[in-house]
């Protein structure tokens, strides 16, 4: 006799999900009155858990010594080289007549946030006079920018 297995004749015999016991519904249900919490005391009340409490014993985090310290966050800033600024001017993305602000650099995708601090480094050569908004600048970059600005002042006179 061939038995064909079909969905309607499969039987596991056990329910897929065991029904949970209903608590606090009279002494006849098996979990009535105190609902399995025992009589009185802290654990019988609601909001039982007290983190780190070990029954009066000194807790583990007070037994162990304090170690280390939390250092202050470093000043995070974006580094921009003069070669990058010159490349942006040469490609026409930046107008060297107007000031190069954080908003301009953010719109070009050079910095990730307008609130971010900027440090200008003197890597590369700057050929045109520029007005740059910055928070920090290296000595070499400052000397290049001031040299170009002083040259442009002497040429205009």
Swiss-Prot record:
InterPro entries to which the protein is assigned, alphabetical: Ribosomal_uL15, Ribosomal_uL15/eL18, Ribosomal_uL15/eL18_sf, Ribosomal_uL15_bac-type
SUPFAM superfamilies referenced in this protein's UniProt entry, alphabetically: Ribosomal proteins L15p and L18e (SSF52080)
Entries under Pfam families matching the protein: Ribosomal_L27A (PF00828)
Keywords for this protein: Ribonucleoprotein, Ribosomal protein, RNA-binding, rRNA-binding
Example GO biological process: translation
Annotated coiled-coil segments of the chain: none
UniProt GO molecular function: rRNA binding; structural constituent of ribosome
Record-level GO cellular component terms: large ribosomal subunit
Function: Binds to the 23S rRNA.
Complexes and interactors: Part of the 50S ribosomal subunit.
Family: Belongs to the universal ribosomal protein uL15 family.
Name the record gives this protein: Large ribosomal subunit protein uL15
Provenance organism: Ehrlichia ruminantium (strain Welgevonden)
Name of the gene encoding the protein in the UniProt record: rplO
């Amino acid at each position: 006799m061939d038995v064909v297995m079909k969905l309607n004749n499969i039987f596991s015999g056990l329910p897929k999900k065991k029904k949970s016991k209903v608590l606090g519904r009279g002494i006849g249900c098996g979990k009535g009155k105190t609902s399995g919490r025992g009589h009185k005391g802290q654990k019988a009340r609601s909001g039982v858990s007290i983190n780190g409490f070990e029954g009066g014993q000194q807790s583990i985090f007070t037994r162990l010594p304090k170690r280390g310290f939390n250092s202050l966050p470093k000043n995070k800033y974006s580094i921009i080289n003069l070669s990058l600024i010159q490349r942006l001017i040469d490609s026409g993305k930046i107008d060297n007549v107007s000031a190069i602000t954080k908003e301009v650099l953010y719109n070009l995708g050079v910095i990730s946030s307008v609130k971010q601090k900027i440090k200008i480094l003197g890597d590369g050569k700057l050929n045109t006079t520029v007005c740059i908004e910055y928070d920090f600048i290296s000595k070499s970059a400052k000397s290049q920018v001031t040299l170009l600005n002083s040259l442009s002042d002497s040429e205009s006179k």
